[in-house]
Each structure stands twice: as structure tokens, then as C-alpha cells.
Curated annotation (Swiss-Prot):
InterPro entries registered for this protein in UniProt: aa-tRNA-synth_Ic (IPR002305), Rossmann-like_a/b/a_fold (IPR014729), S4_RNA-bd (IPR002942), S4_RNA-bd_sf (IPR036986), SYY-like_C (IPR054608), Tyr-tRNA-ligase (IPR002307), Tyr-tRNA-ligase_bac-type (IPR024088), Tyr-tRNA-ligase_bac_2 (IPR024108)
Domain S4 RNA-binding stretches: 339-402
Protein's UniProt name: Tyrosine--tRNA ligase
Cited function: Catalyzes the attachment of tyrosine to tRNA(Tyr) in a two-step reaction: tyrosine is first activated by ATP to form Tyr-AMP and then transferred to the acceptor end of tRNA(Tyr).
Similarity comment text for this entry: Belongs to the class-I aminoacyl-tRNA synthetase family. TyrS type 2 subfamily.
Compartment annotation: Cytoplasm
Signal peptide positions (record): none
Species whose genome carries this gene: Chlorobium chlorochromatii (strain CaD3)
One biological process term in Gene Ontology: tyrosyl-tRNA aminoacylation
Length: 402
């Protein structure tokens, strides 16, 4: 197989990375690969703790695709078994454990989502439950003998919890060993992960060496900050943009990020767009609004199509720039001829509770036919022409009495 030059490969592989352990070893593996004509095997694992992948996952998936574009082979591991342990990386307390059924259910759609980025024909998909689930207790004891408690406490999250006298469960020590056994089983050449995975990647490297296998090169990628601009992107923190979001939601969420994140998002999520990326970067200082809109369009286009991106932008402008209701609102016919505004908002699902409905009215985020509602005690007449209720920025309802 013909590969690009070693320097061309290194230029693409090192782009956007945080750390490579080590660059010299990576170069040696690339040279050997070029001489033999055999592609390197590049491993990436994803625990299905939630059913949806999000743009935070796309950062490492995009790097895996970079390797594929250079002619190398991707191995995507669905961590059905490790998800039952719960990755302690970056956690201040023990993570809830998933059942085998929950992990399998969540992981079912991961591959379909991942191939929005990866080349499916050049990707091996596997579940680590296949080999980790087959290990005996004697195997686990032998595996555990390769690492000490002192080594485990070297990782920051364990050390901080130990000093704070927060409990650390024994099964949490097994997580990096289990992930490391993935590398022993697969004999991969390179493993990718976020910066929070560095310890786990190094354990895999050590275990490969212990088992007489050439140690993997470890490559860490930046963690994508969520749309709130504060924490790592996570579905549990409600700051994520998911692969399965609709084009409209994906565009709107992308536009909601702080201006300070436009460059980071663009570099990490749009590196494949070349000239378009450079144009976005050149606009950030002079016109961040245009830069952010272009960024959001390209994100949607990447996961759907340019046409879907244009439609999502048009939808956003109609709702939030021109403040018009969508054309396709379903008419909801209510039994009552009138209703207190608080009750109406909760009935429609615009507010989860009466107290939240009051808060929305107080914040002046409720209107009926473009007229702001500021009175908690307002009673809304429902007879006659249909009315458009707007609650917050994104919720619209078309209502009338039966």
C-alpha cells in the first residue's frame, strides 16, 4: 500500500493533539508501516454510558479519521464491559455502574453515529465484553498483580479523592487495567483518547510491554468545552450538541456558545474544511457573529448536508431574528373556553411547574400573539381565532378552544 510521506503523515497526525507519547516511536511505526506496506492499527474506545455521541466525542473520532485518510486502519471499541465498571477519570466520586443490558442498549447505535465521521469500510467494530467477559477470576488476579496501589494513586483524580478522604472503590482500580487489556487483546499500534484518558492509555502501554507486545503510542486530544463555556461537554450537564440532534437544534446550540469558544470549536470540529476554516478564523476578531454563523452552518453540513444547514439557518432567523412562529405548528384544540395563564403554560408543557411558569412570566419570556404577558393572574380567552403562545426562545404553541 502506498502511504503519504512520513512528514505529511506526521503533519496531519500531530494537528490539534495535546500530547504524543512518543513522537519518535510514532515516527518509527510509520516508517515500518511504509516499508512493509501494512497499515497501523489505531484504537479508540467509547463507553456507552449514554445512548448518544456528542461533538466532544467527535474530536477523537476526527483524529481517528485522519489516520484512515492516511491509509491506516481504525478499531472502534464499544466498551460494553468497561461501562459496567464506570470510568473514574476526572470524577470526584464513584461513578454509577451500568447493567449489561443498559450498556448494550446504549451502545447499539454508537457505530451508526460514529460512521458519520469514520470510513465504515476501514473500521473494525468490536465490544470489549467479548474478551473481558471471558476472563476468569484467576485471570483478574494475574492482571492485578501487574500494578500497585501506589501507581494507581499517582493519577490525579484518585490522589485528590484519597487526600480528601473520599471513598475509592476497588472496582475503580480495575477500570484502567480492563482498558489496558483491550490493548493487549488487540495488539494495536496507537491508542487515542482525551486528555483525561492519559493514565488509562499509559496503563495499556505498560501492559502491552508486560505481555511481550510492542507498546502502543498514546495520543491525547483536547476536551471540548460544552456550550455553557465552563465544563467539559456532557449530556448530563445539558451542555452538549449530539450527533442525533436535529439540524435546527444543532444549529441553535452551536450558535449558543460564547464567542470565546468560536476559534476552539472551529479548529477542533472543522479542520477538514480547509479554506472555509481559515475564512471563519479570519472573521472572529472583526465579525464574531458572522464567524459563529458560518461555524454553525458547517457543523450542521458535516452531519447532515449543506441544504439542511441552510434550512436550519433560515429556521433560526425566522424564530429568533424576525421572531416569527414556525409555519408548521400543529393546532392544539383545548376543552376550555378560557384558562389562567399559569395553568395554560403547565398544560402545554411550556413550563414543568407552576412556579417555573411564574418565573417565565416574571422574566417577560411569555407572549400570546406577540403581546407580552406580565400578569400572573391573567386569564386567556381561547374562543375564536387560534392564538400563538410563545414561551422562552424556542417553544411555540398554536391553540384555540374546541
Amino acid at each position: 500500500m502506498n502511504f503519504p510521506s512520513i512528514q505529511e503523515q506526521l503533519d496531519l497526525i500531530t494537528r490539534n493533539t495535546v500530547e504524543i507519547i512518543s513522537v519518535d516511536e510514532l515516527e518509527q511505526k510509520l516508517v515500518s508501516s511504509q516499508k512493509s506496506g501494512k497499515p497501523l492499527n489505531i484504537k479508540l474506545g467509547a463507553d456507552p454510558s449514554r445512548p448518544d455521541l456528542h461533538l466532544g466525542h467527535s474530536v477523537v473520532l476526527r483524529k481517528l479519521r485522519d489516520f484512515q485518510d492516511l491509509g491506516h486502519h481504525a478499531i472502534l471499541i464499544i466498551g460494553n464491559f468497561t461501562a459496567m465498571i464506570g470510568d473514574p477519570s476526572g470524577k470526584s466520586k464513584t461513578r454509577p455502574q451500568l447493567s449489561a443490558e443498559e450498556a448494550a442498549e446504549n451502545g447499539r447505535s454508537y457505530f451508526e453515529q460514529a460512521i458519520k465521521i469514520l470510513d465504515a469500510a476501514n473500521t473494525t467494530l468490536c465490544s470489549n465484553a467479548d474478551w473481558l467477559g471471558a476472563m476468569t477470576f484467576a485471570d483478574v488476579i494475574r492482571l492485578s498483580s501487574h500494578y500497585t496501589v501506589a501507581r494507581m494513586l499517582e493519577r490525579n483524580d484518585f490522589e485528590q479523592r484519597y487526600r480528601a478522604q473520599e471513598p475509592i472503590s476497588i472496582h475503580e482500580f480495575l477500570y484502567p487495567l480492563a482498558q489496558g487489556m483491550d490493548s493487549v487483546h488487540l495488539k494495536n499500534d496507537v491508542e487515542l483518547g482525551g486528555t483525561d484518558q492519559k493514565f488509562n492509555l499509559l496503563v495499556g502501554r505498560d501492559l502491552q510491554r508486560e505481555y511481550g507486545i510492542a507498546p502502543q503510542v498514546c495520543i491525547t486530544m483536547p476536551l471540548l468545552v460544552g456550550t455553557d463555556g465552563k465544563d467539559k461537554m456532557s449530556k448530563s450537564l445539558d451542555n452538549a450538541i449530539s450527533f442525533t440532534d436535529t439540524p435546527n437544534d444543532m444549529y441553535g446550540r452551536a450558535l449558543s456558545i460564547p464567542d470565546t469558544l468560536i476559534e476552539t470549536y472551529s479548529r477542533l470540529l472543522l479542520s477538514q474544511f480547509g479554506a472555509a476554516l481559515n475564512e471563519i478564523l479570519s472573521q472572529i476578531e472583526t465579525n464574531p457573529r458572522l464567524a459563529k454563523r458560518a461555524m454553525a452552518r458547517h457543523i450542521v453540513a458535516d452531519y447532515y448536508s449543506p441544504e439542511a444547514a441552510s434550512a436550519a439557518e433560515e429556521h433560526f432567523d425566522k424564530l429568533f431574528v424576525h421572531k416569527q412562529a414556525p409555519d408548521n405548528l400543529e393546532l392544539l384544540e383545548l376543552e376550555a373556553t378560557s384558562m389562567p395563564i399559569i395553568d395554560l403554560l403547565t398544560l402545554l408543557g411550556a413550563a414543568p411547574s407552576k412556579s417555573e411558569a411564574r418565573r417565565m412570566i416574571q422574566a417577560k419570556s411569555v407572549s400570546i400573539d406577540d403581546e407580552k404577558i406580565e400578569d400572573f393572574n391573567a386569564v386567556i380567552a381561547l374562543e375564536g381565532e387560534a392564538k400563538i403562545v410563545r414561551a422562552g426562545k424556542r417553544k411555540f404553541f398554536k391553540i384555540r378552544s374546541k
